[in-house]
């Protein structure tokens, strides 16, 4: 194990310069024993600060944490979301994101964590990203259309706050609108994790829906499945598929491979 300490200067609201400290432990890579992972999802505001979960996680002493998405919800913090203007939307998100840090920060001080955004993290009730395209204006309350509701600047803030500690992306080239990507590989404890997004590149139901009502709700069995099973539709996207083809062939220093996503 190695101890670490981060010092950072900050000028407070009174103009005073202060030095703040953040310290913890970087634990030895657990390559000689079975890896213990704790996986969490959907941190809804009614459970904040999730004390029973945190208490049990401390008791279990996992080697690594996995937060698979919805680290924030629109209702978190007791205040509604603000979609615009852009900077207000970003501050609105950050306030809710800080609450996630307050709840789980002490654990993450000493335990490595994988964190991946999902739909609610970018203020959507469902997300069919279409490779990063924008949603048509005036459709913020429709959960069955392809694209991102919020601006790319805000989405990039979400991606940076939640994923910047991960290994570098397999292919860092931004997608539509200049949106950052974060799909990557992490080896820990002789386990190789492929970390992907099954939301960002996904085609939307509006491309196939020929039924009444919500486009993402099939209420009657389809007579012809070819309507929704077309070669031009994407789930993980070609770029992530190329990554997975490379990842699955490399078994150097690993015993098992695990694919991490949000909601297949």
Per-region residue spans from a language model:
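Metal-dependent phosphoester/phosphodiester hydrolase catalytic core
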Residues: 1-264
């Amino acid at each position: 194990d190695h101890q670490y300490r981060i010092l950072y200067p900050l000028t407070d609201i009174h103009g005073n310069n202060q030095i703040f400290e953040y310290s913890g432990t970087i634990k030895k890579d657990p390559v000689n024993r079975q890896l213990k992972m704790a996986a969490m999802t959907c941190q809804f505001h009614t459970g904040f600060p999730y004390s029973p979960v945190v208490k049990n996680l401390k008791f279990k002493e996992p080697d690594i944490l996995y937060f698979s998405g919805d680290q924030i919800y629109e209702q978190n913090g007791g205040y509604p979301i603000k979609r615009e203007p852009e900077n207000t939307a970003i501050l609105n998100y950050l306030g809710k994101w800080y609450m996630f840090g307050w709840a789980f920060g002490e654990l993450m001080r000493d335990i490595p964590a994988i964190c991946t955004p999902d739909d609610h993290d970018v203020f959507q009730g469902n997300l069919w990203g279409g490779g990063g395209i924008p949603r048509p204006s005036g459709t913020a309350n429709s959960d069955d259309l392809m694209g991102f509701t919020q601006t790319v600047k805000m989405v990039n803030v979400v991606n940076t706050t939640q994923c910047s500690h991960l290994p570098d992306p397999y292919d860092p080239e931004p997608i539509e609108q200049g949106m950052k990507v974060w799909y990557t590989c992490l080896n820990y404890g002789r386990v190789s994790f492929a970390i992907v997004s099954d939301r960002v590149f996904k085609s939307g139901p509006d491309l196939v829906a020929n039924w009444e009502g919500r486009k993402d709700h099939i209420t009657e069995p389809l007579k012809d499945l070819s309507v929704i099973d077309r070669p031009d539709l994407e789930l993980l996207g070609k770029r992530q598929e190329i990554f997975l083809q490379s990842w699955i062939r490399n078994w150097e220093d690993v015993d098992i491979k695990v694919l991490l996503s949000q909601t297949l």
